[in-house]
Amino acid sequence: MASALEDPALQRHFKGHKDAVTYVDFSPDGKQLASSSADACVMIWNFKPQSRAYKYPGHKEAVTCVQFSPSGHLVASSSKDRTVRLWAPNIKGESSVLKAHTAVVRCVNFSSDGHTFITASDDKSIKAWNLHRQRFLYSLTEHTNWVRCARFSPDGRLIASCSDDKTVRIWDITNRLCINTFVDYKGHSNYVDFNPMGTCVASAGVDSTVKVWDIRTNKLLQHYQVHNAGVNSLSFHPSGNYLLTASNDGTVKILDLLEGRLIYTLHGHQGPVLSVAFSKSGDQFASGATDAQVLVWKTNFDKYNIKEIVKLQQKRTCPEAPPHLNDIYPKTPHLHTSSGHSIEINPMFELADTQTFDPPIIDVGANFPYCRQTKALHTLNKYERNDNVCNYPMPPLASSVEGQKEHPLVGVQGALPRSLSNTLEQIVDQLNVLTQTVSILEHRLTLTEDKLKECLENQQKIPAHASESD
């Protein structure tokens, strides 16, 4: 399979944090990227050329996680200051604060319908919250040590969590009970997530391993030993065929789950890589590290069928149709080591001037007075009530800061009506599909021509062999 792939390539290089980047997450439309940092700030990076990045101070200690809501109109962040903040990702940077736990909050994650989010904490608990009312719902408390990560399944019926008690647990949110426990006696996991079909979970271990478990059969399917240090984060490609991993060894690795092997090793960061994430379309992925940098990569591999596979996966997230997975092969547990050859990519040798990718940064905390919590709650609630609706308008953005030259801002709608804007976006998507279809046809035509050439060459050899035999 690797021979048909194209190598990933570094696209963007964002530098604005003053300390380690702890988490990265793409907006649902792929036009923005959120990052959290140990510098106690959240940043929103815009992919539109010559646009500004937004920097949101507000947390009192390191921010551990950040995530867009399914609609993309809210961003949630968790912090060592024991709080969770909900931000409107615009130039005003309004936020509401939830005093979520009695210890460090490690993770925050939205359900696919956008109605609920969960938090994981060093107080050994997982808590669920109603997003619209910003109220506590329930706790899951069977872990006996710090909870590092908690994630919803794609259909929202299950939660996967990992803890320093060396277990990965699967929870049924209807009954609020732990229905499955995977134990790893060699060390705890730093991160856990469901595959796009919701039938497997992958864990990133401090023992430098990556494990894929089948939650239907309660068996370990795949066990990868490809990193030289602890694994901090992982992300499934939307197709479910590839897994992205980040490690303290300073590398990002890409695993082919169908063939059960490592295919790419990416060198771009100067220090441990703490977070990785695929975009919702799968055509990009991002990484954040202790070097305070955010790198955005072009996927390139599996480019011919990304869109169709993603569409099929999205159709199978409906709770009325329980998923059936055949995308993890082989079905027997076995160890995968780094003994096989992977393609090493070091973009820093090819990208001499990475600073040109750094956008201007608006420090929201410096430019605008901090909004009182009551006002922020009122503003956010206006959007949270409609968080599952994708097309409501954002509030008007403030003008540029005094003394600075005015620049266009990403996310600001021009004079175009919403319906016309949506129509144009659909046309662009259709053109992209047509372009991709043409690429596929060209690829198939090339293969056909090669086969035909081979047949003609073999046909010419037949008379020669016949005369030799006579």
Swiss-Prot record:
GO terms for biological process: cell projection organization; centriole replication. WD repeats lie at residues 16-55, 58-97, 100-139, 142-181, 184-223, 226-265, 268-307. The keyword Cell inner membrane does not apply. Its main location: cytoplasm. Keywords: Cilium biogenesis/degradation, Coiled coil, Cytoplasm, Cytoskeleton, Repeat, WD repeat. It is found in: Cytoplasm, Cytoskeleton, Microtubule organizing center, Centrosome, Centriole. CDD domains: WD40. Residues 418-461 form a coiled coil. GO terms for cellular component: centriole; cytoplasm. Transmembrane segments: none annotated. Signal peptide: none annotated. It comes from the Eukaryota. Interacts with pat. Plays an important role in centriole assembly and/or stability and ciliogenesis. Involved in early steps of centriole duplication, as well as in the later steps of centriole length control. Belongs to the WD repeat POC1 family. This is POC1 centriolar protein homolog B.
